[in-house]
Design a protein with these regions (language model features):
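Short, Lys/Arg-rich, polar N-terminal cytosolic tail immediately upstream
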Residues: 1-11
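Juxtamembrane helix-break-helix junctions at the cytosolic face
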Residues: 8, 67-81
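Membrane-helix boundary elements
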Residues: 11-52
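Core segments of alpha-helical transmembrane spans in multipass integral membrane proteins
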Residues: 24, 28-32, 51-73, 88-92
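Non-cytosolic membrane-interface motifs at loop->transmembrane helix junctions
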Residues: 45-52, 106-117
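Hydrophobic alpha-helical membrane segments
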Residues: 83-97
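Membrane-helix boundary connector in multi-pass membrane proteins
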Residues: 95-112, 130
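Membrane-water interface at the C-terminal end of transmembrane alpha helices
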Residues: 119-140
Length: 140
């Protein structure tokens, strides 16, 4: 099977670089939210301690998701199950965020960028990884 990967080695490397760079988004946002609280995402002074605690917890999850994506990078072609699960988690969060758009209106541009990452970019990376898996290994 290693011989089959050779024609796609460059494309695998490009995917690895893309995932490594794009995983900086949840890692950075998660770290900022955990350290500085939800105020880092906008005015939050009147939200109270419970909202801050929830925001820090969710930021920790976001940070961990980014680290988990990083863990797929070295052998991304063999990380199908993990990559699909992480994509499902991110996409589900995006659906929840999109629900908020319909219920309370558009969020800030930063949050809309997050929405694009969750509903478009991350699934595209997953489909790309699956395509490479099929091409390299003939399996899903």
């Amino acid at each position: 099977m290693a011989r089959q990967k050779i024609p796609y080695a460059l494309e695998i490397k490009v995917l690895q670089v893309a995932v490594a760079i794009l995983a900086l988004v949840p890692i950075g946002a998660g770290l900022a939210g955990a350290v500085f609280g939800i105020g880092v995402f906008g005015p939050a002074a009147s939200l109270g301690h419970d909202a801050d605690s929830t925001g820090r917890y969710l930021s920790g999850l976001l940070f961990a998701i980014g680290l988990a994506f990083w863990s797929t990078v070295p052998s991304i072609e063999a990380q199908g199950v993990r990559f699909r699960l992480l994509t499902l988690l991110v996409f589900t969060g995006g659906i929840a965020r999109l629900t908020g758009v319909f219920l309370v209106g558009l969020a800030s541009p930063v949050m809309l960028f997050g929405l694009a990452m969750e509903l478009f970019i991350t699934p595209c990376l997953a489909f790309w990884r699956e395509r490479l898996d099929r091409l390299c290994n003939g399996a899903l």
